[in-house]
Amino acid sequence: MKLSRKILKFTEPLTYRRGWRRAQRSIFPVPLKPMLAQIDGDRAREIQQEYANSTAGYAKYADIEPWLRLNRERVQDLNLHRSAPKRVLDLGCGGGFFLFILKNLGHSVMGLDIDRVPLFGELLELFGVRRVVYKIDAFEPLPDLGQQFDWITAFSTNFYLYHPAKKRWGTAEWDFFLRDLQHHLAPGGKIFFGLNPSYNGGYYTPEIRDLFLSRGADVERERIFFGDGLRF
């Protein structure tokens, strides 16, 4: 790529934001070695060996370190490594990598997910991360979680799909969901969604994007960030 094109590309808002986040990760690093030292190494190796020959798609998560590195970036991009202790709820928490890092940084954490993948339960136990077992469905409120949260997050989840048709939620479903999250969000709390792309490559319809914006979100492709709570 010619230098002029590289410079032009970097001046684009999306490219600039992503470049700035990468720079910030280098300026304010989060060492993983002390966190890995907190893990029972023998048990971690047992889990890895248990799934080493598995053809299941989720078996890749048994190799812990790459997923900790990915989730370290998520923590850094939300500035939670430079934050006072917060109460964090992660929807679709999977194996708990994101929450494990936050716990080691002094935050109070809770995951919410279905109990369909045994590996995730093993990882959560290894990490000492609490999970509430619950399936998120359209037009159904979340359970009473006993507290409100300063942050509610969700990364690469599929709760906003109807199964088995894999049809995505519309504006009515999302609006109900956001209104319900409001009850679980502490005053001044924040919400972040990292959405999966649909089969056509998009992340949401124009109508859903408009809904996110009307509720106070900053929308950057797959990144939906309500930095000052929800607006109704």
Q: Language-model segments: what does each one mean?
A:
Residues 95-105:
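Conserved SAM-binding loop of SAM-dependent methyltransferases across substrates and taxa
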Residues 64-85:
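Conserved alpha-helix/loop element of class I SAM-dependent methyltransferases that forms part
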Residues 151-171:
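A short SAM/SAH-binding and catalytic strip from SAM-dependent methyltransferases
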Residues 168-187:
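A short glycine-rich, Lys/Arg-flanked "PGG" loop and its adjoining helix->strand segment in the class I
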Residues 85-94:
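Conserved class I S-adenosyl-L-methionine
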Residues 142-152:
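A short acidic, Gly/Pro-enriched loop at the edge of an enzyme's catalytic core
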Residues 128-139:
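Conserved SAM-binding strand-loop segment of SAM-dependent methyltransferases
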